[in-house]
Amino acid sequence: MLKDFFSKKKRYATIPSERAKHDIPEGIMTKCPSCRTIMYTKELKKNLYVCDSCGFHHRMNAFDRIESLLDPGTFVELDKGMTTEDPLSFPTYREKVEADRKKTNLNEAIVTGEGTMNGFPLVIGVMDARFRMGSMGSVVGEKITRAIERAIENKQPFLLFSASGGARMQEGVLSLMQMAKTSAALERLDRVGGLFISVMTHPTTGGVSASFASLGDYNFAEPGALIGFAGRRIIEQTIREELPNDFQTAEFLLKHGQLDRVIPRSEMKDTLTKILDIHHVS
């Protein structure tokens, strides 16, 4: 009996049910990765996915961006059905692409089309980093090239928002060829006096930053966007020097003359409209 008195009582933890864990439906709230503020996702969307507390620019999907910029009902998508054929039969590539299609409701990492912005007609391309990290494969390169050719044909400006991890490794040299292909198409646009506005968003890296994204008549970026070719760690190991904390940010590139302006998302449409107005030929 004395032994029972001194023995430890078993303690039991209450494990919350699965239902309790999901009292708040997924996607209702979003936490800012910069200041950790938690906000309603629908309020964040109303604010163009910019944090009210610290101004952090969250990633924006392609159709939300198009909706925020173009006049309602004017957008007509181009080449929607184009999909990759896995030219190198790369292991698990088809499965990963199919998974991204289901997750994003996109066929590829870019949406291209035509529309008007405050009445000014243009051709637009918007990359979406949710699909294979926005990587550039043969379909992405082809869609950009066709959009540029449409701008040439219609004598309209071409506006492109970049968001990419670079060339798509699963397509090998075919993805690298898109750097030259898109750059050559932009040269043809320039030759006929066409306007190309490039807006780099987070992230714009690798072969995309080294080709069409940096070839605009105007090169803009969103605040805090990561923009560069090789990764920070690789550069530091190569030059054996420590790089500044703001290296490869939009602000760093602006300071060193590689961008024309860093534009907050709330000012993007007005700024682009002014440029379209300046270059508009009636």
UniProtKB/Swiss-Prot annotation:
Its cofactor is Zn(2+). Keywords: ATP-binding, Cytoplasm, Fatty acid biosynthesis, Fatty acid metabolism, Lipid biosynthesis, Lipid metabolism, Metal-binding, Nucleotide-binding, Transferase, Zinc, Zinc-finger. Pathway: Lipid metabolism; malonyl-CoA biosynthesis; malonyl-CoA from acetyl-CoA: step 1/1. One of its GO terms (cellular component) is acetyl-CoA carboxylase complex. SUPFAM superfamilies: ClpP/crotonase (SSF52096). A zinc finger (C4-type) spans 32-54. Binds 1 zinc ion per subunit. It catalyses: N(6)-carboxybiotinyl-L-lysyl-[protein] + acetyl-CoA = N(6)-biotinyl-L-lysyl-[protein] + malonyl-CoA. Its EC number is 2.1.3.15. The keyword Transcription does not apply. GO terms for biological process: fatty acid biosynthetic process; malonyl-CoA biosynthetic process. Residues 28-282 form the CoA carboxyltransferase N-terminal domain. Its main location: cytoplasm. It is found in: Cytoplasm. The keyword Nucleotide-binding applies. Belongs to the AccD/PCCB family. Component of the acetyl coenzyme A carboxylase (ACC) complex. Biotin carboxylase (BC) catalyzes the carboxylation of biotin on its carrier protein (BCCP) and then the CO(2) group is transferred by the transcarboxylase to acetyl-CoA to form malonyl-CoA. Acetyl-CoA carboxylase is a heterohexamer composed of biotin carboxyl carrier protein (AccB), biotin carboxylase (AccC) and two subunits each of ACCase subunit alpha (AccA) and ACCase subunit beta (AccD). This is Acetyl-coenzyme A carboxylase carboxyl transferase subunit beta. It comes from Halalkalibacterium halodurans (strain ATCC BAA-125 / DSM 18197 / FERM 7344 / JCM 9153 / C-125) (Bacillus halodurans). The lineage of its organism: Bacteria, Bacillati, Bacillota, Bacilli, Bacillales.
